[in-house]
Amino acid sequence: MEKKILEQLEFEKVKEQFWPYLQTEQGQLELDLLEPIANKDKIQAYFTELEEMAAIFVEHHHFALGGLSDVSESMQRLDLEADLSIQELLAVKKLLQVSAEVCRFYADLENVDLVALKALFEKIESFPSLQGSLQAINDAGFVEGFASPELESIRRQISNKEHASRQLLQDILKKQAAYLSESLIASRNGRSVLPVKNTYRHKVAGVVHDMSASGSTVYIEPRALVSLNEELTQLQTDERHEIGRILHELSEQLRPHSRSLRNNAWLLGHLDLVRAKYLYMQAKQATVPVISDDKSLQLLNARHPLIQNPVANDLHFANDLAVIVITGPNTGGKTIMLKTLGLAQVMAQSGLPILADKGSRVAVFNGIYADIGDEQSIEQSLSTFSSHMTHIVEILNQADSDSLILFDELGAGTDPQEGASLAMAILEQLRLTNIKTMATTHYPELKAYGIETAYVENASMAFDNVSLKPTYRFMQGVPGRSNAFDIARRLGLAEHIVKEAQAMTATDHDVNRIIEQLEQQTLESRKRLEHIKEVEQDNLKFNRAVKKLYNEFSHAKDKELEKAALEAREIVDIALAESDSILSQLHEKAELKPHEIIEAKHRLKQLAPEQSLSQNKVLKKAKKWRAPRVGDDIIVTAYGQRGTLLAQLKDKRWEAQVGLIKLTLKEDEFSLVKLKEEAQQPKKRAVKVVKKAATGKGPRARLDLRGKRYEEAMQELDAFIDQALLNNMSQVDIIHGIGTGVIREAVGKYLRRNKHVKSFGYAPQNAGGSGCTIANLG
């Protein structure tokens, strides 16, 4: 396709109108490279994709992909054995997340028959293992402590050192307060320092890091703090090195999959572009045209995409019609009509929807050529006529019967008689070689050519004789007529002068009268056609209303099913609460071992739905809807850490990737994140484990009950003790605070009646005092 016509038709500006509907950088890149093609099958495939995307939106009104960055350079760096940065890994993490979401979306897609898009969806791969590994980096770009045991250990040491440093500085701050210009801890060169009055600088031993502008204050790092800060600096260096090692390990995991990831990015970008085409089509009331088997075109209510509030026009370019000549004065809209045809054809051959009504038809041309506007070349010192003629010669040498040619003001810029003769000769050559051509001209001689010559048709732009303004209505089959006499008469020229002028051109006056009658007949035909179209639109609106009612009914039905599922869930929760009450009584008897009690509780939770609601179809549907799948993101309950499901094992057990570690989990040991029903389900009880640590006495854990209601605190405490017993923990810390003392007393009462608690008491004063209870288990 000739590049020049894309510039003349401002095709790049048309493509810019699709930008607001794109979500991915890959989709943007594909749009930027988009150009017209002459492969009919490929164009039809683009249109089929667009029609199938419309079908998807009927069922899923808010289908979206989410913003994706371009990862092509990152994949190239992986191929070159380079390690990715945190930002690059975040982009890959987002790509993996969107890939998994699109795979799940396609797996759940119903009531939509896909052919072209099916191949795209099915080629998208999900990588649950990689997705789980990249959970080690959160969305803010922070490498989580659970990314590796070494990083977690280093950060724990950093935290301890920082705490010790602050404590030491606070002690020095109190003792040396008299020597300080301000009672605060400052920072200089990455070190914690004290602002000491210059007159007392020798009273505070340490390293001077800075001095105030006035010289009255020096910033000293106390000697007692120097070694501690050096240890902290070394730990921070170790942290950076460990993060670098983790980034290297993550890059190594991604490296074998760089080609697949690059392919995923392209597939998602292409889906994004198809989605953008559909949204543009909806916003602009555009359509997917039919592709002709021959070279015929039919544009119904075609509009120019770059004009605000354009006038819609019909154009019929039959297969046996070679040339359309648009005659008439300037500023009537002839050039706009020419460009409207050109843009409709270029957009269609680029796989884009066109601004026209349904039923429009386009052809496929190997070449589209145009000579539009003033192409005068100052460098060649050519006149306007010479410039145009040079370009026309190039077009005539390149065009063939599979081409479309658009000429604006053919033959202009020279003697009118010679220009008209040249224009007719050029059009005749194109007619004889059967090359589809549309040309505009203001030469009246071409009207006769259009009437007398086979396979050539006249056309014009309508003019309002009352307002003396063009209407921009395209009148096919009607040559343009002169309005000079009417305009002169309405502007006040003496009637006898007008009549004398008309007498001088009596023949032309008769022709104009015939043309006027043709215009009137064309306008009446247009009105009848518009009435037919209005009836068709009413039918379409009725059809849409019926579909809308059906969809609303379907959605209402789904909401009722969801409501029933929630009610069923409440029944199950009540049953579970009653079972917890029974089991709490068993605790007091101490007849059962801890693991037997917990196992019995777990079995009761599993049996409750089947026993009480085994025949409830709504609940079955809800359970099926909430069932975990490979690739789902999860939260591991015991650790509060994110991961990804890799594979389903036997007995409802799952293999999961958590950071760089693989775990085997039961379904009740994790919860799904980002489920649609998450906001609607009743919140499940969860134990808030604040911290795990190791002591000489064996494993221990800590539970924080501050701010909890009585019932919630007791439920969490019960589950926490169960978990501690299962994990063979010998000692646990329960933080309840002091407050009104209600929770503290309830904790003591619970521990006294639990036969598996050997002893308990308040923590030492420096570890929480009466706000924390330490319990020994056995």
UniProtKB/Swiss-Prot annotation:
Write out the entry's keywords from A to Z: ATP-binding, DNA-binding, Endonuclease, Hydrolase, Nuclease, Nucleotide-binding, RNA-binding, rRNA-binding
Instruction: State if Ligase is listed as a keyword.
Output: no
Give the SMART domains listed for this entry.
Answer: MUTSac, MUTSd, SMR
Smr domain residues are: 703-778
Instruction: Provide the GO biological process annotations.
Output: mismatch repair; negative regulation of DNA recombination; rescue of stalled ribosome
Broad class of enzyme this protein falls into = hydrolase
Report TM segments: none
Q: Which Pfam families match?
A: MSSS, MutS_V, Smr
Record-listed E.C. numbers: 3.1.-.-, 3.6.4.-
The disulfide bridges present are: none
- At which positions is ATP bound? 328-335
Q: Which GO terms describe its molecular function?
A: ATP binding; ATP hydrolysis activity; ATP-dependent DNA damage sensor activity; endonuclease activity; mismatched DNA binding; ribosomal large subunit binding; rRNA binding
InterPro entries recorded: DNA_mismatch_repair_MutS_C, DNA_mismatch_repair_MutS_core, DNA_mismatch_repair_MutS_sf, MSSS, MutS, MutS2, P-loop_NTPase, Smr_dom
- NCBIfam families from the entry? mutS2
Q: What does this protein do?
A: Endonuclease that is involved in the suppression of homologous recombination and thus may have a key role in the control of bacterial genetic diversity. Acts as a ribosome collision sensor, splitting the ribosome into its 2 subunits. Detects stalled/collided 70S ribosomes which it binds and splits by an ATP-hydrolysis driven conformational change. Acts upstream of the ribosome quality control system (RQC), a ribosome-associated complex that mediates the extraction of incompletely synthesized nascent chains from stalled ribosomes and their subsequent degradation. Probably generates substrates for RQC.
Assembly and interaction partners: Homodimer. Binds to stalled ribosomes, contacting rRNA.
Regarding protein family, the annotation reads: Belongs to the DNA mismatch repair MutS family. MutS2 subfamily.
Instruction: Give the protein's recorded name.
Output: Endonuclease MutS2
**Organism name:** Streptococcus equi subsp. equi (strain 4047)
